[in-house]
């Protein structure tokens, strides 16, 4: 039997998709992007009201990250008025994309590597989660998942077990894709990297609960 919590998570997941479609009528792209970013943040805060969520850049001894849409900070983090936050105060660094491109995955993988390296140098137990939340991707689902180590088998009509040798984005900890398409036949999916660095694929609805669980576990 499906739990009420799962039904509510599916409701939230559908709301995110509907908000994306509703905002498509806005022609000013920065405004459209801001609305989507705020909607995702609000849905996370609805689940965990005490979280400190920001957007901006991370700073660490002369190094700055790229501007990012979603930063989860520790409770006692220094905030200020300039959207600049100390790397040591960060718990999650997440890009939000309407239609993620291959180049954006590459850029995120590069900045993630630097974030992970710097965090561990200061504190071996401090792992900053880095990932992407996207509504869709320019490449097909099969192409994207192949780059995360999951090959689609036509005979089995499903994905094979994770293959680390095929994974080219080893610094990205997670990917959430609502996988919105014009025909509405595609299903959302999530890739999560485990403690050992291997990826796990979630494609049974609702997948959003796996994303929400990050904020509960850390």
Kindly give the residue locations of the regions a language model identified.
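Intrinsically disordered, low-complexity Ser/Thr/Pro/Gly-rich regulatory segments
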Residues: 1-67, 72-218
């Amino acid at each position: 039997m499906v739990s009420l919590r799962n039904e509510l998570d599916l409701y939230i997941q559908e709301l995110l998709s509907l908000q994306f479609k509703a905002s498509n009528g806005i022609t000013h792209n920065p405004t459209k992007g801001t609305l989507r970013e705020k909607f995702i943040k609000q849905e996370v805060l609805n689940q965990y009201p005490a979280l400190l969520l920001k957007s901006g850049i991370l700073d660490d001894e002369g190094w700055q990250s790229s501007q990012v849409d979603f930063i989860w900070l520790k409770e006692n983090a220094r905030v200020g008025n300039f959207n600049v936050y100390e790397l040591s105060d960060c718990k999650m660094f997440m890009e939000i994309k309407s239609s993620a491109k291959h180049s954006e995955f590459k850029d995120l993988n590069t900045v993630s590597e630097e974030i992970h390296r710097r965090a561990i140098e200061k504190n071996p137990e401090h792992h900053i989660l880095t990932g992407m939340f996207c509504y869709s991707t320019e490449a097909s689902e099969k192409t994207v998942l192949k780059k995360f180590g999951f090959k689609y088998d036509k005979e089995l009509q499903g994905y094979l077990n994770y293959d680390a040798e095929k994974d080219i984005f080893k610094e990205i900890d997670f990917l959430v894709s609502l996988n919105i398409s014009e025909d509405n036949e595609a299903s959302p999916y999530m890739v999560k990297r485990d403690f050992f660095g291997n990826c796990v694929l979630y494609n049974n609805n609702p997948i959003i609960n796996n994303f929400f669980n990050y904020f509960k576990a850390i």
